[in-house]
Amino acid sequence: PNALGPAWMVSEIETKATPDALLEALNKTDFKTTALVLDHDLPADFSKQYTLDSLAQITLSKAKPDQLTYRVQTTTPAFAVFSEMHYPKGWKATLDGKPVPIINVNYVLRGVQVPANASVIEFRFEPAVIKQGTRLRWLSLGLFAISILVLGYFEYFKTRS
């Protein structure tokens, strides 16, 4: 009866000064309406109060290991909480194609501020180390191929003379 699904919108963000204070507040918070955030995790321009549209919806429309897509319907600004572990090293969020910050919510989950009339929130796992590793792999493969060609070239002319 207390499950909130893959994503939901809250009407309030409650900030706490320390992780201990946040953990203590977890036992007393109604997560259906309130999200807990550490002071230093919340950008200064974020609103802490939201008036929820009674018809507002957020649904998971696509789920892959490295990509999650949510469809959003709201006529008022909102704050969405996602039942996904907050892992800042590699996960990027976009809202209608524009990058948005991912906020650490309720100590372990993700949150995103949603403006009125937004339609798609997408999370992608794109860690920098994977991109660097891919570049290094292609560079190594290229150098290996060049080495083979150079050795083959010299062997060919060595056997001809």
Locations of the language-model features?
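Active-site-proximal, structured, solvent-exposed surfaces of multi-pass membrane proteins
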Residues: P1, N27-S161
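Calmodulin-binding basic amphipathic helices in cytosolic, intrinsically disordered/coiled-coil regions
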Residues: E24
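Aromatic/acidic, Gly/Pro-rich catalytic loop(s) in extracytoplasmic/lumenal soluble domains
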Residues: P1-T15
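Extracellular carbohydrate-recognition regions
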Residues: A21
